[in-house]
Amino acid sequence: MTGERPSTALPDRRWGPRILGFWGGCRVWVFAAIFLLLSLAASWSKAENDFGLVQPLVTMEQLLWVSGRQIGSVDTFRIPLITATPRGTLLAFAEARKMSSSDEGAKFIALRRSMDQGSTWSPTAFIVNDGDVPDGLNLGAVVSDVETGVVFLFYSLCAHKAGCQVASTMLVWSKDDGVSWSTPRNLSLDIGTEVFAPGPGSGIQKQREPRKGRLIVCGHGTLERDGVFCLLSDDHGASWRYGSGVSGIPYGQPKQENDFNPDECQPYELPDGSVVINARNQNNYHCHCRIVLRSYDACDTLRPRDVTFDPELVDPVVAAGAVVTSSGIVFFSNPAHPEFRVNLTLRWSFSNGTSWRKETVQLWPGPSGYSSLATLEGSMDGEEQAPQLYVLYEKGRNHYTESISVAKISVYGTL
């Protein structure tokens, strides 16, 4: 039996060029597909991660309120809140304390609006008036529903039990970007009469799962229910309930210096869908710095094991501002001093707040107190705009209660 010899015949010319052409064409298509994917990835990266562009620059600042009976015979303006509505209107709020600078006493809620990205502001409107009660309203937190466009504003009544017995959590809302407001709604039938001091600052609406679309407003209590906890709504603000919170230690008892006592707080959502709550460290437990809580179930629960402290965020026991941009930049503002309310400073993080950039922006070296942050991003009047950050804060030359000022900051440092 003889074996077959290897063929020495030339390849069939009818098939060779076609086969080579086929594979050559495949290579072209493969390279084209790779190029397209890389281009898309680059575009996505540019859209999703703008960290290399960040050079915050203050482009404008103006006083919105001045204390000392210069506006509507109001003694003191305090507790600034600022938000950008889904339509791009800026709303700035403050407590207008009628007779004194005290946290107690009668007040208005003052509002100014801007429809041109903070260049001009409407005259002051007083949208809530508590009369002449001895322990009046206290702001507060503001949150918008991006699906309905409704803006919700929360405040408390009788939070200090000074000349009154029953506390209430109150709610007003606007469907026209703050032009008009509802009559106040008392939430006591839904959530009870335990003291809940919302904010001060902004609530959030979850943009990611879990519980995408949920409205979250966080705050703190007093001795009857101390610590930090949040109000939640899954029906666009029609009903509200509490999630569980993190209590102070010792619970329900007066606190001493260095006891654990989380207080005024500001939530924001991270890209993984978790919620961070940056809180005032009322009794300087562990450090003269901020308490950081984190929830992985849209604030249904806050667990002690998810409580940390941020030594980089030195703090003199104050309400601070915090906000995150759509690309994941976390901004934080406070008087950056371990003891005194001075040196209002803006910081930012590219790592979800686990570390902070060495660069900072000092907004005011002198007396400065509470602050609130808001961003405007995306298209404005049909044109794509670079992101803008707004800081509404208490500012003075001798004392931080002298005025409330708004600073506009270009995130990319462009004019």
Curated annotation (Swiss-Prot):
Changing G243R: In SIALIDOSIS; type 1; no enzyme activity and no transport to the lysosome. Changing V54M: In SIALIDOSIS; type 1; mild mutation as residual activity is still measurable. A motif (Internalization signal) lies at residues 412-415. GO terms for cellular component: cell junction; cytoplasm; extracellular exosome; extracellular region; intracellular membrane-bounded organelle; lysosomal lumen; lysosomal membrane; lysosome. Changing R294S: In SIALIDOSIS; type 1; mild mutation as residual activity is still measurable. Keywords: Carbohydrate metabolism, Cell membrane, Cytoplasmic vesicle, Disease variant, Glycoprotein, Glycosidase, Hydrolase, Lipid degradation, Lipid metabolism, Lysosome, Membrane, Phosphoprotein, Repeat, Signal. Changing A298V: In SIALIDOSIS; type 2; less than 10% of activity; rapid intralysosomal degradation; impaired enzyme folding. Residues 1-47 form the signal peptide. Changing G88A: Does not affect sialidase activity. Changing P316S: In SIALIDOSIS; type 1; no enzyme activity; retained in the endoplasmic reticulum / Golgi or rapidly degraded in the lysosomes. It is found in: Lysosome membrane; Lysosome lumen; Cell membrane; Cytoplasmic vesicle. It is a peripheral membrane protein. Changing S182G: In SIALIDOSIS; type 1; normally processed. Its EC number is 3.2.1.18. N-glycosylated. Substrate binds at R78, R97, E264, R280, R341. Changing G68V: In SIALIDOSIS; type 2; less than 10% of activity. Changing S351R: Does not affect sialidase activity. It is linked to Sialidosis: Lysosomal storage disease occurring as two types with various manifestations. Type 1 sialidosis (cherry red spot-myoclonus syndrome or normosomatic type) is late-onset and it is characterized by the formation of cherry red macular spots in childhood, progressive debilitating myoclonus, insiduous visual loss and rarely ataxia. The diagnosis can be confirmed by the screening of the urine for sialyloligosaccharides. Type 2 sialidosis (also known as dysmorphic type) occurs as several variants of increasing severity with earlier age of onset. Catalyzes the removal of sialic acid (N-acetylneuraminic acid) moieties from glycoproteins and glycolipids. To be active, it is strictly dependent on its presence in the multienzyme complex. Appears to have a preference for alpha 2-3 and alpha 2-6 sialyl linkage. A C-terminal internalization signal (YGTL) appears to allow the targeting of plasma membrane proteins to endosomes. Belongs to the glycosyl hydrolase 33 family. This is Sialidase-1. It comes from Homo sapiens (Human). The gene is NEU1.
